[in-house]
Structure formats: C-alpha cells, structure tokens
C-alpha cells in the first residue's frame, strides 16, 4: 500500500506553484526583452521580483528552513502585486497574472501553516 498522501502537501503545492510562476514570468520577460512600453515597467519590475522571491521560497521550502514561512509570506505579497499589475495588461500578461495569483495563494497558505517539526 502506498503511504504517500493523495494530495500534495501545502509545501509541495507552493513549490509547484512557485515554479510555474517563475516559468510564466521568465517567459514573458524573454518575450518583451529590454524594449517595452513605459506602462509595462511596473509589471516587468514585479515579474523580476516575483522570480527572485519564488526562487528563494522554493529553496527554503526544499531545505525545510526555519524561515520558510516568512519567505513565503513575502513571496505571497510580491506575487499578488505582480498578478494585479499583469492583469491590467494584454496577451501573455494574463497567463503571468494567473500563475502569480496561484503562487500568491499557495505561498499565503504556507505562511499560515504551522512549521514542520523535523
């Protein structure tokens, strides 16, 4: 009998959502390059911040770090801001918005989850 949970743990769901957010943000940033309309500047900056915070969140969760919840709390704030900003833009930005919104939700869940006892 398989003893693994039927559903991913909040930590695993957060890692997966963060990885998808990283892919979405990197994809759109590679598409727009360095020449983009001025009204996209905030979205570009928030995508960059989301990538960094998601990378750190994934690393801290993977290491079962004692600061994983705090890292995820910050990641949730940045990803939510990115999602809100990207939702106002056309085309591929809507995909980014959805990915960041999902990462924000999963990170928020981890931030509110009691720490694992190893």
Feature map (PLM): residue ranges:
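Amphipathic alpha-helical hairpins
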Residues: 1-118
């Amino acid at each position: 009998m398989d003893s693994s949970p039927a559903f991913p743990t909040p930590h695993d769901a957060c890692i997966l959502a963060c990885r998808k957010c990283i892919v979405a943000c990197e994809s759109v940033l590679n598409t727009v390059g360095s020449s983009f309309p001025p009204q996209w500047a905030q979205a570009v900056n928030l995508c960059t911040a989301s990538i960094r915070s998601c990378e750190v969140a994934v690393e801290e969760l993977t290491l079962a770090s004692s600061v994983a919840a705090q890292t995820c709390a910050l990641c949730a704030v940045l990803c939510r801001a990115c999602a809100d900003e990207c939702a106002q833009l056309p085309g591929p930005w809507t995909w980014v918005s959805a990915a960041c919104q999902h990462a924000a939700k999963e990170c928020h869940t981890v931030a509110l989850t009691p720490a694992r006892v190893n």
